[in-house]
Amino acid sequence: MKFTRLNDDIAFKLNCGFRVSDAVPSESSYSRLVTQLSESNVLDEVKERLILQAIKEGFITDDTVAIDATHFEARDKAPTKEEKPKAEPKKHGRKSKAEREQWLKEQAEKEANMPLYEKKIGDQLDVSLGELRKEVPIDPKWGVKKNSEGKNEFWFGYKGHLAVGTSSQYILQSFFSSGNLNDGKAAIPLLKGIHERLSLPKLRYQTMDAGYDYEAIYKQVYKMGHQSIIAYNKRNESEIIGFDKHFAPTCFREHSYRYDSYDVKYETLKYTQPKECIDCPLANDGICQKVFKMKITKDLRRYTAPARGSVAWKNIFKRRTAVERVNAYLKEFFQLNNVRYCTGKRTKVHFDIVTLIYNASKLAVDRINTQLITQVA
């Protein structure tokens, strides 16, 4: 770690809060400060206070939050790949009743003793926000992601998970983890953070890509009183007879019913007859219904308001690009991918400072713009 610029560039030194006559602290002083920050929650507390201040001043009035993750490499040296021992060949045939009971018992014990983030996502629903934040793995690990060409890209490092207001583009919640953590396993901590720590009365929608298509995430969003706008990830599911690819009912001739409205009181989607049914000879024979109603609680993954496939659903889903823009800003302008520290604890300090400075910059710009508008008026 070098501080030659602080000594050589007076303007930079003044911008950093030093006077010309001040001595620049030593490298070890900065190292001790980073260590102290890594062992406390002070940066998390400051980030939260800043967001609450932005809400108080009226700069955050979003109705939609977009959630996504971005990866960045560690400064630590990547370990050599360990060869996994060959698994013992499985015995042919069915297990006896006693063997199966013993196997089920062993599996239950194994799952019970797993770390929280190695369990199923649904197990996070009843866990407190404090424990979710405390138990997250933060050591650098190998991560993998498919690129635009469908090929696997590997990196050794971390992931930053963000929940961003789609219109204000403030980072409402951030979450730091090892590079091998499944994106979906960070969604519930982010959602609980928004629900429990922030007051956003206009918030209605949570939008995410197909990597977050897990039933537990839909349940968490539903518990918050919001709607999930999440791309559907078809997992070897057979086609449902009588419904189209967006799970809207179809008529006798397989034309899709049109989404009409949502009844908030009864949590019901209303679908009306397809336009093709106007001239259909079966329309007046009592074979096809004029109206279909579907409760979203029948299947939270498939039914949301507005309904999947509708113009309104697509327009809300487009807002998800806000979090991708913020991820790009953090890497291009705020040094997110220029990690200067080893170990996960110290890198989390880097991540927290980056997200804090981004939000602080947003708040400063919003205040300046408000002053300029007031002066013009």
List the predicted regions and their residue ranges.
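Short, charged amphipathic recognition helices of the HTH superfamily
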Residues: M1-D8, E324
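Arg/Lys-rich, glycine/proline-spaced intrinsically disordered segments
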Residues: K91-E99, K234-E237, A364-V365, T370, ...
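Basic, amphipathic alpha-helical segments enriched in Lys/Arg and hydrophobic/aromatic residues
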Residues: R308-A377
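Short secondary-structure capping/turn micro-motifs that flank functional sites
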Residues: T70, E237-S238, T347
